[in-house]
């Protein structure tokens, strides 16, 4: 039984979880995290490439194309401000570490998408947002009741109400202005210390917020789904078309 692939998958998953923790805590992921992840996994990848080269060199050219494609795509999305630098580096590293789609013990269960693993991770990451929206809607209908949904449907699908002391790592859908008037916005704003102090001053217990989750969390989710199931977006499109 070949344990190289699952070992590499586990190592990368641990690094991604660590990156999520750092991003949530300090909003920054040092470059050394990605360097260490490459150092820990490249020996396995190099050996796997050597094995493939003996059997079929054509696959190597396809793998090289996939790596170049993802590196360029990740950089382009970063330049377009679609996500942060850490997210781009994570995708680039995944492209290098997994030039071939990992296939072991019957996984992935559904498919391999277009055969470019990092691309499947990215597409899975994107569909996590609507899934989270349905989860928030279900939660809010139970916790807040259906009546409020008619007044503020956006808040029901994109946020939730929390106590003031738990605002950390959330953006505000509602806050108090300088005169103490309650303001509600469609685009959540990052809370300042002044905003938080004002809410406490007027003894506001709860406000509507949206989670300010770093995209690396979505990437980690997409990674796990790509390993176990495959490319979900590719599967959905194949069912429709």
Feature roles, as predicted:
Residues 1-241:
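A membrane-topology feature that recognizes alpha-helical transmembrane segments
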């Amino acid at each position: 039984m070949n344990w190289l692939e699952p070992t590499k998958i586990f190592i990368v998953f641990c690094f991604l979880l660590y990156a999520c923790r750092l991003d949530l805590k300090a909003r920054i992921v040092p470059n050394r995290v990605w360097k260490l992840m490459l150092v820990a996994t490249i020996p396995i990848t190099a050996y796997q490439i050597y094995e493939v080269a003996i059997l079929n060199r054509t696959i190597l050219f396809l793998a090289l194309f996939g790596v170049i494609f993802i590196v360029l795509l990740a950089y382009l999305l970063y330049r377009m401000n679609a996500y942060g630098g850490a997210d781009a580096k994570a995708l680039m590293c995944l492209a290098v570490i997994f030039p071939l789609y990992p296939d072991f013990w019957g996984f992935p269960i559904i498919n391999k998408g277009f055969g470019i693993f990092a691309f499947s991770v990215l597409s899975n990451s994107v569909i996590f947002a609507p899934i989270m929206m349905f989860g928030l809607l279900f939660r809010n209908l139970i916790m807040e009741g259906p009546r409020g949904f008619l007044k503020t449907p956006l808040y029901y699908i994109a946020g939730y109400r929390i106590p003031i002391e738990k605002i950390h790592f959330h953006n505000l859908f509602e806050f108090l202005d300088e005169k103490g008037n309650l303001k509600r916005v469609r685009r959540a704003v990052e809370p300042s210390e002044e905003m938080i102090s004002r809410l406490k001053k007027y003894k506001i217990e709860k406000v509507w917020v949206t989670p300010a989750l770093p995209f690396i969390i979505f990437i980690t989710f997409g990674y796990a789904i790509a390993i176990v199931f495959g490319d979900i977006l590719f599967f959905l499109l194949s069912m429709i078309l």
